[in-house]
Amino acid sequence: MTMITDSLAVVLQRRDWENPGVTQLNRLAAHPPFASWRNSEEARTDRPSQQLRSLNGEWRFAWFPAPEAVPESWLECDLPDADTIVVPSNWQMHGYDAPIYTNVTYPITVNPPFVPVENPTGCYSLTFNVDESWLQEGQTRIIFDGVNSAFHLWCNGRWVGYGQDSRLPSEFDLSAFLRAGENRLAVMVLRWSDGSYLEDQDMWRMSGIFRDVSLLHKPTTQISDFHVATRFNDDFSRAVLEAEVQMCGELRDELRVTVSLWQGETQVASGTTPFGGEIIDERGGYADRVTLRLNVENPALWSAEIPNLYRAVVKLHTADGTLIEAEACDVGFREVRIENGLLLLNGKPLLIRGVNRHEHHPLHGQVMDEQTMVQDILLMKQNNFNAVRCSHYPNHPLWYTLCDRYGLYVVDEANIETHGMVPMNRLTDDPRWLPAMSERVTRMVQRDRNHPSVIIWSLGNESGHGANHDALYRWIKSVDPSRPVQYEGGGADTSATDIICPMYARVDEDQPFPAVPKWSIKKWLSLPGELRPLILCEYAHAMGNSLGGFAKYWQAFRQYPRLQGGFVWDWVDQSLIKYDENGNPWSAYGGDFGDTPNDRQFCMNGLVFADRTPHPALTEAKHQQQFFQFRLSGRTIEVTSEYLFRHSDNELLHWTVALDGKPLASGEVPLDVAPQGKQVIELPVLPQPESTGQLWLTVHVVQPNATAWSEAGHISAWHQWRLAENLSVTLPAASHSIPHLTTSEMDFCIELGNKRWQFNRQSGFLSQMWIGDEKQLLTPLRAQFTRAPLDNDIGVSEATRIDPNAWVERWKAAGHYQAEAALLQCTADTLADAVLITTAHAWQHQGKTLFISRKTYRIDGSGQMAITVDVEVASDTPHPARIGLTCQLAQVAERVNWLGLGPQENYPDRLTAACFDRWDLPLSDMYTPYVFPSENGLRCGTRELNYGPHQWRGDFQFNISRYSQQQLMETSHRHLLHAEEGTWLNIDGFHMGIGGDDSWSPSVSAEFQLSAGRYHYQLVWCQK
């Protein structure tokens, strides 16, 4: 044990937090989570241990601007002005200091290993009681599961130790410091340390004791470590559980270790042995270690599909059977290996349906509770995810147990990121920083290696490629050869990775960056000598209204076996709750706490909002990742299962044939599909509709019974086909009425019964409509070529740093947002049964014509207004965001009804999950409440739209809400939006894709850009 004077002044003088060679003082060695059961049955059933005591709850707390400001007296007693704070928590979430959101830029001046003199410091203290029995025998430990970023610990006024690495436990022996009865802990937490230079992750920078604190009482002679691994024969019919156990304390001849393996209530295997390990070299072996091997016939294999678990109980006892203590862990029999360029689990090539997940809670910051963790896992499973990357640090210990039990593949990632360094490998190639990096990698492996869900180790994130990475790669491969290692830094295909694991590489487009090119994922596989699998560690940047082009990735994954999937960036928006002056909560992002530097809303890249409400894009991910694929030939549906291990035993296939959303026939067939098998379903002869319309066959795979992660009735997969329809023509009903045209100097006015249409001759716009005496429009019907910018449109542009390549900057520079209409033509003609208004406009900016829009409005005797639009786009202007029409309707109706793709928001490059049907939703549901307001709520493939007294028919896209594009564009946060008068309607003949390969460069694929020079569309507007 390192001995240091208890004086605070001496501790401060040492400045351990500015010494990369000091990562801990007196911290105990890493190991899997312990409970020290004194009853083996409690260990088997994972009941709470009487030897493990939580110290979570209210602690005393005082905040200081720097450690030097902490008074020496605090070591002995609480300060008069100390407050209370909940542990675990981030102190910034309790009004102390401010959270800082930054992506790449370090939040402190870069001068490693030194940190600012103004180094916010939190002083925690807790008074607790210890029973005399804990002091008479054994060892009492204190475990801090997570403290950011470094801390010193005192007990009863005496210095105990020091720890850093905010995402792994720091554990200390308190035995020599405790007394029977009342004891006092004092923990001094520093916001910044030299470890902060290794923790430059894209997240909020927060501080404090943010994970659990507990006391653990172990016997004097104790289990100090244990590790389980599974080995198999070629066909997985026989397995061996290999358990390595290490003890410490008095090594006596009478000591024995028993490892028993349980499957539920049944003991499958057991073995007992005295201590004395295998011979290592000519000097012998380890006297305090032992390896046991238990044979298991026909093991129930673990996978994310079927997470079969056994329970291993490790008992330390005497020869006569007297139990000293027991430890235990869940065991999953599974094998991970790379063979012939494929990542295999239990001999089958995996397809990673993955997502990156930060530990984030909108109210609690980086504090994770079990309820939130389970909620995340259930949502992931329900949306066809099978893997999660712990980005970018080891997670709360409970997370891995839950992934074991519910079934998720885990990439466990070391808490190392130096993204803000120049060059990025400045520290990771420096041997002075190897001890700090080594602690972060080795301790992660030692803590988590018993978890079957952990199938890949990661050396960290965005830290370049240095010699330290190569050393740590070799260490992992020597200690745990059962798992591959991945690391993206330095180009994603260095010597430090078993898997090509790029981030944001595109399907077909090379990005030839200097030193670290990102090849297209298809090309990467064919590079000379490249035989590794490719799994994208990050792709599909889900920032705001995004995930366009996601289907292209999944087409490639299914086409090329060595393209084995990837991890979407990312799971949850990292917004935080703030309160306005009236106590109303609102969602905040970078800069909202006065934090500098900050990267604004770049913290919100989630498939779900911070409160776990899904983004519409989550449905697209679910659909593309679904485990059943479908093919239609005539009346035959072929269902293919992509499950590797699971036989469909809880699935029904529902099919429906509908004409314009009206069901004509339906049925239900049980699915009985072997893993990777097929089932052919023959449909009956389908009825032929008598009327015209779109005929669609829709299939849904429904789970009739509840599972551990889904309720009964859960839909896991679906598909639609448009069927051939009989050719027929429905003639409009004859009308004897003829609209009446009145011409004045200012207007053309058309009347028919109780309806009137007014066209302004000076503007050329439809300026008003009446039904009876009620006006229908608050603004004229105008052409529209812009949208409120998406995050993907903005890229890295901001007020102080313009990216001229970003779509929004190109649109602004070209004048798309400022364009004014110059009237070229506005005429009226009376036809035999209708009135025809013809208009033409040149949309100009600073004398330059950007668009020419020609429209005809044909109002017939039935009251229908048929609108025909032709648009010419100037060849030298950027491709527009949309080509459509917009107006502000006077009504506010409760519901919106449409025939088209839905029900969720969808866009041209993100619509594979949308179904064609007749949908009816509240108006409020047509708006997607992205925290950073933008274009939202589009519905594509629309044949009919009904709202209030109005109906629109044609083939168009629309969005409808209380917010104008102008307001969405000018507003920084959703809570600042105000419902405008009436309802804003946008009807588009064409709309550009949204992109999403990344959010900092134009990522809309060419096929989804509006690159043609001419566009034509039609629609009919009438009243019901």
Swiss-Prot record:
User: Superkingdom, according to UniProt?
Assistant: Bacteria
The record's subunit annotation is: Homotetramer.
Q: What class of enzyme is it?
A: hydrolase
State where Mg(2+) 2 binds. Answer: 598
Catalytic center residues:
462 (proton donor), 538 (nucleophile)
The residues that the entry says bind Mg(2+) 1 are 417, 419, 462
| Reactions accelerated catalytically | Hydrolysis of terminal non-reducing beta-D-galactose residues in beta-D-galactosides
Q: Which UniProt keywords apply?
A: Glycosidase, Hydrolase, Magnesium, Metal-binding, Sodium
The protein depicted here goes by the name Beta-galactosidase
Site positions for Transition state stabilizer: 358, 392
HAMAP family noted in UniProt: Beta_gal
Required co-factors:
Mg(2+); Na(+)
Query: Record-annotated residues binding substrate?
Result: 103, 202, 462, 538-541, 605, 1000
A single Gene Ontology CC term: beta-galactosidase complex
Please state the Enzyme Commission number of this protein: 3.2.1.23
Q: Does the keyword DNA damage apply?
A: no
Positions that bind Na(+): 202, 602, 605
Q: Which molecular-function annotation in GO is an example for this chain? A: carbohydrate binding
Recorded family membership: Belongs to the glycosyl hydrolase 2 family.
Q: Which GO terms describe its biological process?
A: lactose catabolic process
